């Protein structure tokens, strides 16, 4: 039997999205561009087609767009290692946990995370 995460272990927003990023698993693409400043999300989005804003909560702003045949998520991390830690953990949760059932997915998903900016490279 798969482990079931408690409310304290897996915090969700009232709409069922992940707590800080306010994203749902189906909104996440395999390639994620990470920028620090939320204003840079729109700047990166100018280089994509079919751009769709996804969420905007605190320092975490996101959109989804396309570069050729590749869907891409652009997401701001805010300032500092603490915020980056939240982003990386919540992206992993979106990719590998069924939020409705609060259980790990049967298969794992790897994401391609690319950091764009002046510092904070992973």
Regions found by a protein language model. Name each.
Residues 2-122:
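Metabolite-binding pocket within alpha/beta catalytic cores that recognizes anionic/polar moieties
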């Amino acid at each position: 039997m798969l482990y079931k995460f408690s409310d304290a272990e897996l915090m969700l927003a009232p709409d069922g999205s992940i707590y800080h990023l306010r994203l749902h698993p189906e909104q996440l693409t395999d390639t994620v561009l990470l920028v620090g400043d939320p204003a840079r999300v729109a700047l990166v989005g100018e280089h994509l087609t079919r751009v769709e804003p996804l969420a905007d909560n605190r320092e975490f702003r996101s959109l989804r767009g396309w570069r050729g045949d590749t869907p891409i998520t652009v997401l701001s991390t805010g300032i500092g290692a603490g915020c980056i830690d939240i982003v990386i953990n919540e992206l992993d949760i979106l990719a590998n946990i069924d939020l409705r059932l609060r259980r790990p997915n049967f298969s794992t998903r790897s994401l391609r995370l690319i950091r764009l900016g002046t510092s904070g490279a992973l």
